[in-house]
């Protein structure tokens, strides 16, 4: 999001009357709005089905991991392995392609995971984690975990990275980023 914010700031400096409307959602929400002409472009996190769009990969990656309370036993580990998650109450993204990505990372025992809650926006899941509802499978740096936050993030091992993608209906718009 920081890359988009910087580009928006440069554009607004040159054209001060531009107004922005930000919409946050999962890939399903954003592609629906793109298809209906309600948004001009979208920033996606892989995996996402963008087969009907022109897109470019942004020059950054993010990593998957687990958001948890700092006072839980897993917080002492530097990384989280598949077997560490067995028997724990998990909050996971409700996106179908994300489920496929995690099942590939986890391996044969994916069906044994105790996914108690699904979410479409991590902010809401982070409140559930903060209140002791479980552990959220998520991307790093979306929820604040520094300072006085009771939460921490631990990356998955083996590492599960994702790329950020920018898509737009009009190829000319891609030059703005």
Show which residues each predicted segment covers.
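Conserved small/polar residues in nucleotide/adenosyl-binding loops
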Residues: 166-171
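Short beta-strand->loop
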Residues: 54-65, 136, 140-141, 149-163
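A ligand-binding cleft/hinge motif common to bilobed small-molecule-binding domains
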Residues: 43-52, 105, 122-151
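Short loop/turn segments at beta->alpha junctions
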Residues: 26, 81, 120-121, 139
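Flexible hinge/capping segments at coil-to-helix
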Residues: 52-64, 68-90
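Central regulatory/effector-binding core of bacterial HTH transcription factors
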Residues: 1-50, 110, 118-119
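Secondary-structure junction motif
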Residues: 88-109
